Every structure is written in C-alpha cells, then in structure tokens.
A protein has these predicted regions:
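Structural signature of tandem alpha-helical TPR/SEL1-like repeats
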Residues: 45-48, 79-85, 115-124, 149-161, ...
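Helix-start (N-cap) detector for alpha-helical repeat units in TPR-like alpha-solenoids
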Residues: 31, 63-64, 102, 136-137, ...
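Canonical positions in the second alpha-helix
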Residues: 55-56, 88-89, 127-128, 161-162, ...
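N-terminal leader/linker segments that initiate helical-solenoid repeat arrays
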Residues: 18-68, 80, 84
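Residue-level recognition of tetratricopeptide repeat
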Residues: 38-39, 71, 110, 144, ...
Length: 221
C-alpha cells in the first residue's frame, strides 16, 4: 500500500490517540472533539481543512491546531513542511506529554521518509526514541531511514529490537526480511518474510517481497 494513503487513512486513529494522551487543564473534551473533526475534514477537503486549521491556530488552538495544520499540509503534498512543523511541535513548550511528543516525532520521521530524506527521518526518530525508547513505530522509522541510506546492518538491529517487544510484528518482520535480502542472507530473509505473512496474510507488499526473495534464492542455486 502507498505510504501516503496509509498515513492519511490513519487520521481518525491519530485523533483518538491524541485524545487518549490528553492531560492538563487546557486539554478539554471540546478541543479534543474539534481536533478530531479537523483531521476528519482533511479526508473530505484538504485545502479547506488547512485553511480552517490555520484560523484555529491563530485563534489559540494550541498544539491540536498546529498538529492539524501539519497533517493538512501533508495531505496537500507538502511532506517537508509538515515534517518540519511536527518536529517543531515535538520540541515546543506546548508539545504535550512525553508520549505525545514521541508520537509527533514518529509522524515527522515517516513524513521525512515519504519526502525521501532519510537523514532527517533518522534525526526525528532518534529524538523521539530519546523520549520513549520502547516506541515501536519510531524504531521502525529509524530502521527504514537506515535502509534507505544503505545501512542495512543498522536497520536490522533496530528491527530486531522491535521484534524483541513484539515477535509477531508483521511490518518489522517484512522490513527485516528486506534488510537481510539486501545483505544476501537469503535463508534468514525467507524465514522472516514467511513469518510476516503468517502475521498478516493479506499484505500485498509482503507477498511481493516474498516473490523477490524466492527469485533471489532460485538464481543462487
């Protein structure tokens, strides 16, 4: 699945996660509801969502408004600016709890990856992991940044760490299979890709990667 479409499809879940981490006197149910509505608006009309989010931000919408602005920018195709704003939000005085800041860094890292800027993705992911070392999405994002830069051994280390927390994580297994394929370790890549498909049998990208691994094994014989 295209990463952009996948991330946009997760907007409602992001809104729920944002609300679950909301603490403090200024984090009202009304603001949570407005943030959720703002994210949902992106799927309907991303230009209008951006305009409304900017107005809300100027009216004192705080981190929720800033977050929605960034997500709308991403939907409009401005991955760099969206990632930059999320990095800034994670560092800001109104960035929220450590868990929320880590989530902002995770979104930023994934947006940098879409923008094909692995160095920036690595920085965002590492900054997030400094806050929350067991954040699996951050560790996967950093592994993907390593792989995009050709550092497959380092990518494998991060992915193995993810699998230490969640041995059946389909995404981590798939990415590690690819890292091992790139290193020519075909039997290990084959084992990972089969386990990934067991965890998520309908994953098209995983099935395609299995085909590549099987072809590499065939050519090696």
């Amino acid at each position: 699945m295209n990463l952009r479409r996948l991330l946009l499809g997760l907007l409602p879940l992001i809104a729920i996660s944002f609300a679950e981490h909301s603490y403090g006197e200024d984090l009202t149910a009304e603001f949570d509801a407005k943030h959720k509505k703002c994210l949902e608006r992106i799927a309907e009309d991303n230009e209008l969502a951006f305009e409304e989010a900017m107005i809300w931000q100027d009216d004192g919408g705080g981190r929720r408004a800033k977050h929605c602005v960034a997500m709308a920018l991403y939907a409009l195709g401005h991955e760099d600016e969206a990632a930059h704003r999320l990095d800034a939000l994670a560092k800001a005085s109104d960035g929220g709890t450590p868990a929320m800041r880590a989530d902002f860094y995770s979104e930023a890292a994934n947006f940098w990856l879409v923008a094909n800027k692995p160095d920036r993705a690595y920085k965002s992911a590492t900054d997030g992991l400094d806050i929350k070392v067991d954040h699996l999405d951050l560790r996967i994002a950093r592994a993907r940044a390593y792989a995009m830069s050709g550092y497959y051994e380092y990518a494998e280390i991060d992915l193995t760490s993810v699998l230490g927390f969640d041995p059946k994580h389909a995404g981590a297994l798939r990415y590690r299979a690819d890292a091992r394929l790139q290193q020519g370790r075909l039997s290990e890549a084959k084992a990972d890709i089969e386990n990934s498909l067991k965890s998520d049998p309908n994953a098209v990208e995983t099935a395609l990667l299995r085909g590549q691994i099987n072809e590499a094994i065939r050519k090696q014989k």
